[in-house]
Every structure is written in C-alpha cells, then in structure tokens.
Amino acid sequence: MTNIRKSHPLIKIVNKSFIDLPTPPNISAWWNFGSLLGICLILQVLTGLFLAMHYTSDTMTAFSSVTHICRDVNYGWVIRYMHANGASMFFICLFMHIGRGMYYGSYAFPETWNIGILLLFAVMATAFMGYVLPWGQMSFWGATVITNLLSAIPYIGTSLVEWIWGGFSVNKATLTRFFAFHFILPFIILALATIHLLFLHETGSNNPSGMTSDADKVPFHPYYTIKDILGLLLLVLALSTLVLFSPDLLGDPDNYTPANPLNTPPHIKPEWYFLFAYAILRSIPNKLGGVLALIMSILILAIVPLLHTSKQRGMAFRPISQCLFWLLVADLLTLTWIGGQPVEYPFITIGQLASIAYFSIILILMPVSGIIENYLLKW
C-alpha cells in the first residue's frame, strides 16, 4: 500500500513542500527566516483575530476598546502586546530575509523575488493601517500625514485623498475602512506567500555558494525542520522577552493619548520599521519628489536583478561587493535613526547624505563593483 503521505491529494502537497522537499545540504541559518515569517504571519492572524473580537472601529470607542482589552479581557494585554511586538519581529525577519536575498543573489529567481516585493508592500500596508486602529495621537496624525502624501499626485491627488478618507479629514469612515482592510490583507498575504513558495519550489532553493546543488540534495525533514525549530525558539524567546519585560519599548508614548484633531504632536513619526523610508521622504524638500523617492526606496528592489553585473551569483566570494553590502546596512540603520529625529540641523543634512548614499550604493556602486571583480578574476 502506498504511503498516505505520498498518495493523499492534500497531504502530498504538504509532503512535497515541507517533508520530502529536496534541499541544498549547505544552506545556513540565513535561510531560516522564510519559515519564521510564516510563523510570524500565523501568530499575527491568530492574535489579531482575538483582538478583533473585542475591538470596536468607531472613533468614539476605539481607544477605550483597546484599553478595555488590556485591562478587562483575560490575558488581553498579552494578546495586544504579542500582536504589536509581533509586527516588529515580522519586520526584523523580513529585513533579514530580503538582505539574505540580496547578499546571496536569490533575486536571480525573478518570479519568487517579484512576488516577495508584492508581499513586502502588502505587509507594509497592513502594518500602517494596524497602527491607525488604537486611535491614539500618533495613529491619527500618522494616518493624516501618510495618506496626505497622495495629494502630491498631479490633478487627481486631492480628490484621491478625500476618497480614501471618506470625508474632508481622517474620520470615522477612515477608521472603519482601515479596520476592514487590516483584517482582510493578512489573508491576501497568506495567498501571496503560498504563491511565493510555489515559485520557489519550481526552481529549488539557492545556497550560500551560489552554485547549483542539483547533484547533492537532502530531504527537508528531519534536517531543516529541526534547524527551523531552533530559529523558532530564538524568535519566541526574543518576542516573549519584549512582551513581558518592555512591551512599549518600540512604541510611541504619544499613542497613549487619545486622538485629538486640534492638537498636533511635536514630532510625527511612524513605527520604527518605516523610519528609513520616512527619512528618505523627508530628505527631499519637494512634496512630489519626496513621495517618488519614498516609493522608489522600496521599488528599487525590483530592478536589483537587472543591475547584477557579476559572473558569480552571490557575494560569498566577492569582497568589494561585501563591503558595499554592509555599507548599505549601516546606511539603512543611519536612515532609521534620522527618521526618528526632529527636522533640524544637522539631521536634515545627514538624512540627505544617507539618502544619496542609499540610491548610489544600489544603482551605481554595486554594479560597478561586479564589473571590477570580474576584471580582477580575468573573467
């Protein structure tokens, strides 16, 4: 009799994806983040579902419903902070996952890479709308500032913003629709992640050497299931530490003040994981220019495969590119820091220089380093 694992129409799909999947034997811990992202997504959907049972998306009661969750619901504070800090963990894993893809040349799988970019946009949209829901000061003003950026679009901008708001300012209609979108988007992300995985399994995983590993594969289970469990334990440890010891470490104190349209906070800023893009937006004195730079800071990932000039796939044996990669990481950390600072000297100048460096490294220096490395190897 055939093993049910290999014959059952549904179970065999799981088997081909997570059990008998042929995997390169040399993939490092950097390949853990894909499964960690899947776990983060499931965690967010579950905690979000329980939060939605107690939350009300009305401007009059949203803030108090979140307070009620934290004070009166059994373990409501755990669920709320798991959800809020789970988003931070999600983005940490996302940035590591994208960084790994850039370092080891995983962008050479164009379908998988492009679905990944769509996933990034969907997750960013979900996180932004989720930040609006507690209806604190930073929720309200963050929503006002970020949606207002669309007014920079010529001719239709103002109408578009008012259409998104459902009125002439961020109001009850805005909060209700943001809640609806925040609820539905994770399921769209789930579908996209499945397609992402489907395309990946068409080609098989990349590996640190960047060379094909068709001649040498191992089954995913038990080798990588065990390896992924270690990553999961570390993720749970980090998240639990954050939730139980300093749940508000990554949040903004202004969000504990109920939303007030008549009082603007001194420094409006998004959550930490958007600060790098926010710094790029602010570094350009023109509104439309800033919005374009903001979009390009993420969309630039789509042209990374076109800028690959090296004859080697990954950066494992390319020291010049390695230096540039880590320079890019340092630059992104600088931008993240600048995004949280007030708009004054010297932060404006540092932000502008860091923004120029960001685009220069990706668009000019990395392709040039690939050509230089080919020349040095006489290829």
From Swiss-Prot:
PROSITE patterns: CYTB_CTER, CYTB_NTER. Binds 2 heme b groups non-covalently. The keyword Cell membrane does not apply. Gene3D superfamilies: Cytochrome Bc1 Complex, Chain C (1.20.810.10). Keywords: Electron transport, Heme, Iron, Membrane, Metal-binding, Mitochondrion, Mitochondrion inner membrane, Respiratory chain, Transmembrane, Transmembrane helix, Transport, Ubiquinone. The keyword Amino-acid biosynthesis does not apply. Heme b b566 binds at H97, H196. GO terms for biological process: mitochondrial electron transport, ubiquinol to cytochrome c. Belongs to the cytochrome b family. PANTHER family: CYTOCHROME B. The cytochrome bc1 complex contains 11 subunits: 3 respiratory subunits (MT-CYB, CYC1 and UQCRFS1), 2 core proteins (UQCRC1 and UQCRC2) and 6 low-molecular weight proteins (UQCRH/QCR6, UQCRB/QCR7, UQCRQ/QCR8, UQCR10/QCR9, UQCR11/QCR10 and a cleavage product of UQCRFS1). This cytochrome bc1 complex then forms a dimer. This is Cytochrome b.
